[in-house]
Amino acid sequence: EGIALYEGRAYFTTKHDNRVWVYHTNTQELEVLYDVKTSDNPILTGVDNVVITPTGDVLIAEDGGDMQIVVLTDEGSVAPLLQVVGHEQSEITGPAFDPSYQRLYFSSQRGSLGKSSGGITYEVSRSDLV
């Protein structure tokens, strides 16, 4: 589903098995970072779009699931960053940072109405950075 590059690593998701992978381009090794079936904290389902923070944490948007963007670290820690409530018929799409990494943007594809005309885009920023 989603793919993002960061410092010689390609991160991508596979929805059919709810996994997040990383391909290390320098060693040509493929590694599973997250698997819903084996995770100690299986909160991430419907893995979809991916974006990387400046520190290398992986943000994964859910297609369905709990309508969350979840943070996954290289150490395997997984935690919800945010959740959109009341949009059960939608999915989170297109997470992206502004060039300064001060703001995160994402959309609810069908919004609270569950219709293609109901989509909405959000901007998230930290109050101490604005």
Where are these regions (language model features)?
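Sequence/structural signature of beta-propeller domains
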Residues: 1-130
